Every structure is written in structure tokens, then in C-alpha cells.
UniProtKB/Swiss-Prot annotation:
Protein name stated in the entry: Frameshifted structural polyprotein
Marked site (Cleavage) residue numbers: W261, S262, R325, S326, A748, A749, R809, V810
Lipidation (S-palmitoyl cysteine): C721, C741, C742
PROSITE patterns, per database record: ALPHAVIRUS_CP (PS51690)
Other notes: Structural polyprotein is translated from a subgenomic RNA synthesized during togavirus replication.
Coiled coil residues, start to end: none
Cytoplasmic side: 714-748, 785-795
Protein family according to the UniProt entry: Belongs to the alphavirus frameshifted structural polyprotein family.
SUPFAM superfamilies: Trypsin-like serine proteases
Originating organism: Chikungunya virus (strain S27-African prototype) (CHIKV)
Length: 824
């Protein structure tokens, strides 16, 4: 909330008028008309006085256009006779366009509420008084051009790119109001109208420029709506980067490609205790082509300054006119450098040497397997310092020589593919190997090479070992060296090369020593009775001396060379050095990788059978989705059948670069949860055996206990009911009581007596007694028929507590465990 101003005061200029009651309507009587003739006479007298008292303006004589045309025709033949042509007349300077209504309104408000921010006397931006706060863009360097505001302690917010502080009390009347209401339409700022639409502020391209950072945007009531930070060119219009307010919330609107609009502060460099803008070096030395050695000295003196690369670019571009940018500009820095000879451990014949193609550094940080190799020769530059893609230059003794780029090669265990070259750097894709060799063939068909021990094993992108990028597949994040020769943040150090001894420059001629320079600068020193040394560019003869008494070395301080640890330094120059940018930056990109063919899947009991068809070595991995993943993986190179067990928690299988496959077991059992009691017990027993046995046992115990109690109570009641009748001799029990208590109403005869009685009295009933065994047989058969059902119901008592091996089935449906599927 510190960056939200509050309106604790009111500005007089933009306050609405106070409300007043409407005046009552009064009837005004018409005035009496004056006499018409008197009024006309007074008007006539005043008009005559004006005409007589006003001075008559002097009329300029009217020019005769015809005479003017005739004079021009007469002068035309006279001008043709003159041999010298008159220079064309300069066009009169166009008058500055007057500011419009919106500009005038903003300027009137800005006179009090904005202040310039200056750095070393130059305006870099503005600070604005809004509400009760002073707001200034954080990227604008300098101090506010006001003694009171410059003393304030500002709070900085990098999120909103803003700095703010409380306004001094005596300046609150100069501040502007602010508002968070922003209906779509047109607003005002210093350069005219600002359109607000779709949550963006836009202006016509060219209306804003660097130096406008911090200017406010006003609505038609003079309230601040936003503060400008920068802009992004979008063709006909420019989108503004602003800080605004949305109901007590600070919001920063930054369009894509927005640039800060603070005025650029020139970076200063040093030359002979004199400072100058790095982008505008002084005339001596001002150009590398005119004063190469002095220019390199100036660059070495400013190598640690922030504007070094501006000075380098300005020194190498001698033309004062603006030049069109091209790819050749990136090679321009190499005209101040040269290739060199460096030590190589293996020059191709099993011995070391000073090779023109020595390996300095091999980088393999890219995850796509690309190598970035730095060598001592330079590719893409000719010996005349011109850019040529088809050439490379190398150091042949002391002189750079040209060779064709087509003869350049890189190899490990097999030849590599060169994907990019520039300067000292080569990009290559190489197969697996233990050594790296770089070489070339010169114009004399002589091969030069250098071999270094280097273990190279290209990393695998994704989960498949493919050999070439597919046209279709899957994109995975990776890193590579971008094939761009533009300047990057990486840099290498360069220095003046040391003097190179060369004994071939000395020759003996009848007691004298002749030094042949061969168009070079040679430093010599001879000890022939006295000290004889110097620096020469032409041939020289040393009298009365021998070759063994002289030393000659080629010196060249007009070019830099790479600061290699394999080359000795120039002891006279100490630690003086320069810097140049290098190409091919490492960047995060996406790589296209293939996707393996989907496997053929067969579902079984608690398992999945997968038939795999790899086109190249493909990784198969699987894990459990429980607490213990038990991760397993293997590379599959040929057709293979894999059987995987599906645990209860689920199984995740990943084949190649495809999305993971997920499987879950489907629980099922015999019986049904909504059937007969024995089916219900069987269903739950197979799913939850322990709990089912406990529940059935407790229920059976309770049921048997209740049945036993009921039988006991019935027996007690029966005994109480029949006891009185048993104690009474010859008592007759009532029929209802005998029916309930299952007792005879009276003492009955024995079976023999009853049978005699039936035989004598009711013979049909006597013979019906023979059907009793038949009825018993029928009842027994029915009981035997229902016995299997009873046994199946009670079978759970003899089963183990583990689940049925057939109770689990596997199902899958779009890797969704909640989605239903048919049991397999």
C-alpha cells in the first residue's frame, strides 16, 4: 500500500463548484423602450467620430504579376549563358507546430506537478507529485531538480519499477489527484492523446521517446490515471508500459518487447587522462585502420570500463556515416586479431608440435550432444581481414595463410558432422569416442591435425536411443549451442603476441651479418664488440659480426591473439589485454524425439502381458503406485514379451517416450450382495474374510442365546400351567391350554388298546396308519434334497482367512481408476 497515493487534500484548480440552491424565478417587467430616433442619432455620431479619429493605414502598392513574369523570362536566357550553376536555395525551416488542446492542458497541469530528473546536467526522466506521494521510475538515474524533493528518502519497488516518498507539507497544493476509474477511451499526456482499450495504453508511433519516463497520463478532469515507464513499438502504434491503480491495487502493465524510456547516459572512457564518450572516440586514435597499434593500446586501457564494447565497435567502424547491419559486422572484430601457433600433444604422427590447429577448449554442456570446440585457426575470415564463408586462415610460420573451409574435419571414433563455424569456434555432432581430432588441408594439399584425449558419450534425450531427429514425435526440453554468430555475453581475452624468434632472417656475408626482414618488422640484437640492437623494417647489414652473435625476432603489435596458456606471454607488456565476444551461446530449447510403437497388451489374473516392438533401443520402466514404488527399468533392443504383476495399489508402466500407462486391479467375488443369506455371506467372506467370520459368529451367538432363552421361558411357563392339573386327580385339561402346552386333555389309552379299538370300530382309520412311514420317507427325501444348500451356506466355517485366488480381476479404462470397466 506504500505505492498507492491518498487524496488527503483538495486542489483548487479542479474542484467542482459547491452546490447552491437554484434561484427562484422572478418575473422581470420589460423596460420602457427609449425613443427610436434618439438612439439612431447617437449611433450615427459615434460612427462618424471613429471614422474621423482613426488613422488611415498606408496601403502597400500592389505588385504587377505580369511584369514579374516578364522579368523572369528575361533573366532566364541570361542565366543560361553563365557556366556556373547557382547552388539550390535552402528550404526555409518549418515552423514548430503549435500544441493542441490536449497538449496545452497537460502542460498547464505539469507545470506544478512534475519535476525533471537530471544526471550530470542532462534530463533523464521525470518525477510526478500524485496524491500525497512523489513517484519516480526506479530505472531513471539521477536526482530530482528540486532542493526539497532531492532530500527525500525514497522507497524502491523492483516489482513495479517505481520509487516513492511522502510529499513535503508545503508542496501538497501542487500535487495532482489520481483515480482508478479508467473507462475505455482517450486520455491526455504531454505529447497528445493516449488511447485506452483492452487494458492497454497506446499512442501513435513517434509520439513518445526515451526521456519521457515518469510522465503522467491525465483524464479530462486533470486526474492522474497512470505513470509512463516505457513503450513497445508495434508498427503504426506504440504500446505504453505504465504503472496504474485498480481499486487500491498497484498494477504494472508491460507489453511484450517494452523498452525503458529513460534517457541513455553516455558511458565515458579514458585516453591520456582525458574522458570522452565511449561511442565517440577522439580522432587520434579514432580508427583501427589508420592507427592500429595506438587504437589497440587505447582499447587495452579501457578494457575494464562498462563502455568497452562501444569503444571497440566505434574504433573498428571508421566511417562516420550510419551503416546497414549485416552478418559481416559480427566478423568485424576479427580484423584486429590473428591466428596463432600453439602446442599440441599429438600432431598425427605420435609426437607433439606447435600446430596451427591446436585445440584450446572442448565444451560439452549441451544435452543434445553438440560439442563446441575452440581452435587456434580462424574460420570465415581471409588473410585480408574480409569475411568469407568458404575460407579459413591459419598461421604459417609468421604469416597468416588461407585454406579452404571444405578441408576442415572433426572426428572421434568416426567422422563428425560440423554444424557451425565462426572465428576460433566449431560446432560438431560426434559419435562416441575416447579422442577428438581436428584438422584441415591447406592449399598445398598438406594435412594438419591435432588430437586430444577426450571421452565423449552423447547423452540420450528422452528414453530412446535414436540416430536422427524424426519429423513427427514428441518435444522434450533440452539445451544446445545456438547457431548464431551474433555477439553473446561470453567473451575471451586477447593480448599482444610476443616477439617470435626466427634464425632464418640472419645470413653470413663475408664477415658481415645481413638481416632480411621480408616485409616484416624485426627486432635484432648483436654482440659484436659492443651492443647493437634496434627495430627495423628494411634489410640491414651488421659489419664485422657473425650469425651466432646476433638474435632476430619478428614483432607484430598491430594484431591481438587469443590469450592461450599454450603460448608464452609478452613480458614487456605485462597484464595488458583486450576482450572480444564469442558466438554460439548455450540456450534452453526443445528437441524433437521419436515415440515408440504402442505395445500389444493382454490382461490376465493380477497381471498384464505386454508385447513390445522397439525400432531402436528403448527404455521400459515400471513402478508400483503405493508407498514403496519398487522401480524397475530395462533397455529393450528386440521384440520381447513382458509379464508384469499388478499390485493392489496399481502399476505405472512407461514405454519409450510415450505417456505412462496405468493399471489397477478390479476386486470381484462369488455370490451377490443382494441375494439370499448364504449368497450374501459368501460374497462378503471372499472380500473381507476376517470381518465376515467375526460378524457371523457374533450374530449366531446372539441368535442362539435368544432362542435358548425363549425355549427356557416357554418351558417354565408350560410347567407352571400344567402343574395344578397334575396335582389334581382326574382333572381334565382345557383344550386351548393343552394345545398351547402340547399336553393331553386327559389320560389316553395305550397304542395297543387304541389299535384294538380302531380295528373293531374304525377299520379305515386303522389302515391309514400304514401311510405314516410313506410320509416319513417323503419328508426324508425332501430334507436330503435341500441338504446341499445348507452345506454351502455353512461352508465358510471351514475356509481359510486369505482371499480367494479368483477374487481379483484386472481392468483398465483410459488410466482412470474411478471409471468403470468390465471384469476380465
Amino acid at each position: 500500500m506504500e505505492f498507492i497515493p491518498t487524496q488527503t487534500f483538495y486542489n483548487r484548480r479542479y474542484q467542482p463548484r459547491p452546490w447552491t440552491p437554484r434561484p427562484t424565478i422572478q418575473v422581470i417587467r420589460p423596460r420602457p423602450r427609449p425613443q427610436r430616433q434618439a438612439g439612431q442619432l447617437a449611433q450615427l455620431i459615434s460612427a462618424v467620430n471613429k471614422l474621423t479619429m482613426r488613422a488611415v493605414p498606408q496601403q502597400k502598392p500592389r505588385k504587377n504579376r505580369k511584369n514579374k513574369k516578364q522579368k523572369q523570362k528575361q533573366q532566364a536566357p541570361q542565366n543560361n549563358t553563365n557556366q556556373k550553376k547557382q547552388p539550390p536555395k535552402k528550404k526555409p525551416a518549418q515552423k514548430k507546430k503549435k500544441p493542441g488542446r490536449r497538449e496545452r492542458m497537460c502542460m498547464k497541469i505539469e507545470n506544478d506537478c512534475i519535476f525533471e530528473v537530471k544526471h550530470e546536467g542532462k534530463v533523464t526522466g521525470y518525477a510526478c507529485l500524485v496524491g500525497d506521494k512523489v513517484m519516480k521510475p526506479a530505472h531513471v538515474k539521477g536526482t530530482i531538480d528540486n532542493a526539497d524533493l532531492a532530500k527525500l528518502a525514497f522507497k524502491r519497488s523492483s516489482k513495479y519499477d517505481l520509487e516513492c516518498a511522502q510529499i513535503p507539507v508545503h508542496m501538497k497544493s501542487d500535487a495532482s489527484k489520481f483515480t482508478h476509474e479508467k473507462p475505455e477511451g482517450y486520455y491526455n499526456w504531454h505529447h497528445g492523446a493516449v488511447q485506452y482499450s483492452g487494458g492497454r495504453f497506446t499512442i501513435p508511433t513517434g509520439a513518445g521517446k526515451p526521456g519521457d519516463s515518469g510522465r503522467p497520463i491525465f483524464d479530462n478532469k486533470g486526474r492522474v490515471v497512470a505513470i509512463v515507464l516505457g513503450g513497445a513499438n508495434e508498427g503504426a502504434r506504440t504500446a505504453l508500459s505504465v504503472v496504474t491503480w485498480n481499486k487500491d491495487i498497484v498494477t504494472k502493465i508491460t507489453p511484450e518487447g517494452a523498452e525503458e524510456w529513460s534517457l541513455a547516459i553516455p558511458v565515458m572512457c579514458l585516453l591520456a587522462n582525458t574522458t570522452f564518450p565511449c561511442s565517440q572516440p577522439p580522432c587520434i586514435p579514432c580508427c583501427y585502420e589508420k592507427e592500429p597499434e595506438e587504437t589497440l593500446r587505447m582499447l587495452e586501457d579501457n578494457v575494464m570500463r562498462p563502455g568497452y564494447y562501444q569503444l571497440l565497435q566505434a574504433s573498428l567502424t571508421c566511417s562516420p556515416h550510419r551503416q546497414r547491419r549485416s552478418t559481416k559486422d559480427n566478423f568485424n572484430v576479427y580484423k584486429a586479431t590473428r591466428p596463432y601457433l600453439a602446442h599440441c600433444p599429438d600432431c598425427g604422427e605420435g609426437h607433439s608440435c606447435h600446430s596451427p590447429v591446436a585445440l584450446e577448449r572442448i565444451r560439452n554442456e549441451a544435452t543434445d550432444g553438440t560439442l563446441k570446440i575452440q581452435v587456434s585457426l580462424q574460420i570465415g575470415i581471409g588473410t585480408d581481414d574480409s569475411h568469407d564463408w568458404t575460407k579459413l586462415r591459419y598461421m604459417d610460420n609468421h604469416i597468416p595463410a588461407d585454406a579452404g573451409r571444405a578441408g576442415l574435419f572433426v572426428r572421434t571414433s568416426a567422422p563428425c558432422t560440423i554444424t557451425g563455424t565462426m572465428g576460433h569456434f566449431i560446432l560438431a555432432r560426434c559419435p562416441k569416442g575416447e579422442t577428438l581430432t581436428v584438422g584441415f588441408t591447406d592449399s598445398r594439399k598438406i594435412s594438419h591435425s591435432c588430437t586430444h584425449p577426450f571421452h565423449h558419450d552423447p547423452p540420450v534425450i528422452g528414453r530412446e536411443k535414436f540416430h536422427s531427429r524424426p519429423q513427427h514425435g514428441k518435444e522434450l526440453p533440452c539445451s544446445t549451442y545456438v547457431q548464431s554468430n551474433a555477439a553473446t555475453a561470453e567473451e575471451i581475452e586477447v593480448h599482444m603476441p610476443p616477439d617470435t624468434p626466427d634464425r632464418t632472417l640472419l645470413s653470413q656475408q663475408s664477415g658481415n651479418v645481413k638481416i632480411t626482414v621480408n616485409s616484416q618488422t624485426v627486432r635484432y640484437k648483436c654482440n659484436c664488440g659492443g651492443s647493437n640492437e634496434g627495430l627495423i623494417t628494411t634489410d640491414k647489414v651488421i659489419n664485422n659480426c657473425k650469425v651466432d652473435q646476433c638474435h632476430a625476432a619478428v614483432t607484430n603489435h598491430k594484431k591481438w591473439q587469443y590469450n592461450s596458456p599454450l603460448v608464452p606471454r609478452n613480458a614487456e607488456l605485462g597484464d595488458r589485454k583486450g576482450k572480444i565476444h564469442i558466438p554460439f551461446p548455450l540456450a534452453n530449447v526443445t528437441c524433437m524425439v521419436p515415440k515408440a510403437r504402442n505395445p500389444t497388451v493382454t490382461y490376465g489374473k493380477n497381471q498384464v502381458i505386454m508385447l513390445l516392438y522397439p525400432d531402436h533401443p528403448t527404455l521400459l520402466s515400471y513402478r508400483s503406485m503405493g508407498e514403496e514404488p519398487n522401480y524397475q527399468e530395462e533397455w529393450v533392443t528386440h521384440k520381447k514379451e513382458v509379464v508384469l504383476t499388478v499390485p493392489t495399489e496399481g502399476l505405472e508402466v512407461t514405454w519409450g517416450n510415450n505417456e505412462p500407462y496405468k493399471y489397477w486391479p478390479q476386486l470381484s467375488a462369488n455370490g451377490t450382495a443382494h441375494g439370499h443369506p448364504h449368497e450374501i455371506i459368501l460374497y462378503y467372506y471372499e472380500l473381507y474374510p476376517t470381518m465376515t467370520v467375526v460378524v457371523v459368529s457374533v450374530a449366531s451367538f446372539i441368535l442362539l442365546s435368544m432362542v435358548g432363552m425363549a425355549v427356557g421361558m416357554c418351558m417354565c411357563a408350560r410347567r407352571r400351567c400344567i402343574t395344578p392339573y397334575e396335582l389334581t386327580p382326574g382333572a381334565t385339561v382345557p383344550f386351548l391350554l393343552s394345545l398351547i402346552c402340547c399336553i393331553r386333555t386327559a389320560k389316553a389309552a395305550t397304542y395297543q388298546e387304541a389299535a384294538v379299538y380302531l380295528w373293531n370300530e374304525q377299520q379305515p382309520l386303522f389302515w391309514l396308519q400304514a401311510l405314516i412311514p410313506l410320509a416319513a420317507l417323503i419328508v426324508l427325501c425332501n430334507c436330503l434334497r435341500l441338504l446341499p444348500c445348507c452345506c454351502k451356506t455353512l461352508a465358510f466355517l471351514s475356509r481359510n482367512e486369505h482371499r480367494c485366488p479368483h477374487c481379483e480381476r484386472v481392468r483398465t479404462r483410459n488410466s482412470d481408476p474411478e471409471h468403470g470397466g468390465s471384469t476380465v
